[in-house]
Amino acid sequence: MTDTKTPTLDRVAGPADLRSMSDTELRNVADELRAEVVEAVSQTGGHLGSSLGVVELSVAIHAVFDTPRDKLVWDVGHQCYPHKILTGRRKQMPTLRQGGGISGFTKRSESEYDPFGAAHSSTSISAALGFTISRDMGQPTGDAVAVIGDGSISAGMAYEAMNNAGHEGRRMFVILNDNEMSIAPPVGAMSSYLSSLSELSRAGPFGGLVAIAEGMEQLAPKPVRDGARRARELVTGLENRGTFFEELGFDYIGPIDGHDMAQLLSVLRGAKARATGPVLIHCCTVKGKGYAPAEGSADKYHGVSKFDVGTGVQAKAKANAPSYTAVFGDALTTLAEEDPSVVAVTAAMPSGTGVDRMAKRFPNRVFDVGIAEQHGVTFAAAMAATGLKPFCAIYSTFLQRGYDQIVHDVALQGLPVRFAIDRAGLVGADGATHAGSFDIGYLGALPGMVVMAAADEAELVHMVATAGAHNDGPIAFRYPRGNGTGVPLPETGRVLEIGKGRMIREGDGEVAILSLGTLLSDCEAAARILEAEGINATIADARFAKPLDMALIANLVQTHKALITVEQGAMAGFGAMVLQSMAAEGLLDLGCKVRTMCLPDRFIDQAAPAEMYRDAGLDTMGIVEQVTRVLGRDLKVVTLNAKRR
């Protein structure tokens, strides 16, 4: 991707090349880098806005610090594309977030410049402190630098880390990338605090750098100048007129213009030269900086599909069915219209989970708690204790962050919190870090928990209604990313009988396939292929991973030679619960062969979801092959491969 449009960037094979450049040349690198990021993401899709906001910061950090010996930790990693280009992965950018390509996040196995993987928020300061302790204990590492956004710093883990870092008092650097914009606008008191800075701190060894920041403010573009003015109000507000960060033991520098290369270099060089303990540098940036369509968009082009660089118009395939997220949001809104006790809780993902649809109709009954899943779960539990009906809508991968609260505050007390688990299963371009692989197992282990999985979007509508009617304890329902199957949607949901599955297709007694979730359509497709080969399979939709429909399972075992379970989850999930329950009931002694199909015992890297499930053996032909193996049939490999294509 090198051409005459990027003469200065072409000279950068790695960060060491930046350190021999003049400040003017570094400015040129940033300008060329920004254009290249836009061009690269236009071809692959990805997290554009956040990456454009840290172009100058990425160049400046690598120019000042001795990476990879100095450890640079990006929080979340949405903003890491400039970093990847600067650290030897420029030629690989066309493979960004593609199967077999480079990750959309930092990843230890990908580069020595990625010392710590990222994707979930608010981990960077903890990791940086760990590297700092390692340095001080004689390990071959230098300074540690954490870059964290104003959304991520709102999470409790960030404060736990800052509290510990302040107590340790060791030399490390935290750069607060303050753009007032994560996926959704940051919420909570800390966001307000960051938005109300009024006076710069001039005490301590960094007084001169603070003065530089203040002097440069008037020269900054209006968005940054306004951000700096807003940010300066952070510093007072405590009785001794120190910042919140200073109270935690950090030296505070800022706010500075995160797009002014001269200012960034001056402050970073000065901080590196003078720091003896933990330092927080507060940078004001503009998400989507330098690309007009991104700067003018409400979400600043946080996550985009492929797009036209000239117009910014994204190429999105026309959907034949609504997304599962949209179906959930609409079903929840309908339920809320009927039942005033229904409320919704989300953790900084109102649009991602679909609860923004309910918020438009009932803004006072939808609560965005910020990046705070632990708090959100307990918050919902207390509302359930008073008779409200909270729907806690959180992605499967992020619900893991609140597991202790699910156990201690919800399940142990038998409180009827409704967990709407979006992005269940494999999710595509975001890869292993965002896969919803484990919720069946970690929720199914809890006494009193009901766990459902929707086979299609119509079933999801019924499960929303079922959750709304369930008051005997916690209940969860899972559904995947992406669009539904196109089945007709009911106007209102039907309350399902707890723990009862359904027969989909009656076979001839050779093999039964018990499906949980949206792989039901693959099971049906597999049955059609098998029928052409003389195998007439029975198919059932379990609907519930817990409690299991033991009457259905017993019937399948007693009337078939083989039973295969299919799920979009990890080991120790649905199949394991079926086997354990069969063992307890003596059903394993009846001679029916039992096989389980689940995700393999490894993390699966990014690719299109269909490719990921094919890799896992959880697609139509994977099911066909499992059936033929268990029955001892010898379908020709040529036939199977032809059907797979």
Curated annotation (Swiss-Prot):
The keyword Metal-binding applies. GO terms for biological process: 1-deoxy-D-xylulose 5-phosphate biosynthetic process; glyceraldehyde-3-phosphate metabolic process; terpenoid biosynthetic process; thiamine biosynthetic process. It is an enzyme of class 2 (transferase). Transmembrane segments: none annotated. It catalyses: D-glyceraldehyde 3-phosphate + pyruvate + H(+) = 1-deoxy-D-xylulose 5-phosphate + CO2. Catalyzes the acyloin condensation reaction between C atoms 2 and 3 of pyruvate and glyceraldehyde 3-phosphate to yield 1-deoxy-D-xylulose-5-phosphate (DXP). This is 1-deoxy-D-xylulose-5-phosphate synthase 1. It comes from Roseobacter denitrificans (strain ATCC 33942 / OCh 114).
